[in-house]
Amino acid sequence: MSVREVIQKNEAKLKKSIEAFQHEIASIRTGKATTALLDRVKVEAYGQLMPLKQVGNIGVADVHTLMVQVWDKGMVGPAEKAIRDANLGLNPVAEGQSIRVSIPPLTEERRKEFVKLTRKFGEDSKVSLRNLRRDMIQEIEKLEKEKTIGEDEKNRGKKDADELLHKYEKQINELISHKEKEIMEV
């Protein structure tokens, strides 16, 4: 294995970390309705916990309203309860076989909590990136010990790993900044 292969293999993992972070912050509430808001909601259905999106369609009715069209009429009650109990500050209302979820405006205090949560997710993601960088450097040093590569190539590989880390940390910082603006927007 070469340094380039080590870097490429781990760059794919770094990209996955960024994608996971994007998915994580997409579920954080802003003032607008988004289907990602209900991604983590689990419904007690057919004897097991299932994601809400597996028991019905979730759509955006308008800027402040989500609509959940439940496929099985018997699941309306449990789905409504799951949304209410998800600690998202939402109050769902059942209307026949669908559930209307109004997104109330965020209070200043709640906005600050969501900003803190966004930053926490960002820090967790950065730790994950740093761990991947550490793994890359260990693999590169192992290659040098096995005499597969020379010291110059090892140093170049470490430099590439650092540059890659900084590139992805910068992306996370930009995503955090963008999400904070979105949350604080009234």
UniProtKB/Swiss-Prot annotation:
GO molecular function: ribosomal large subunit binding
InterPro entries: Ribosome_recyc_fac, Ribosome_recyc_fac_dom, RRF_sf
GO cellular component, one term: cytoplasm
Gene3D superfamilies: 3.30.1360.40, Ribosome-recycling factor
Localization per record: Cytoplasm
One GO term (biological process): translational termination
Organism domain of life: Bacteria
Keyword Protein biosynthesis on entry: yes
Keywords assigned: Cytoplasm, Protein biosynthesis
Major location (coarse): cytoplasm
Coiled coil residues, start to end: none
NCBIfam families in the cross-refs: frr (TIGR00496)
Role noted for this protein: Responsible for the release of ribosomes from messenger RNA at the termination of protein biosynthesis. May increase the efficiency of translation by recycling ribosomes from one round of translation to another.
Family: Belongs to the RRF family.
Protein name: Ribosome-recycling factor
Origin species: Chlorobium phaeovibrioides (strain DSM 265 / 1930) (Prosthecochloris vibrioformis (strain DSM 265))
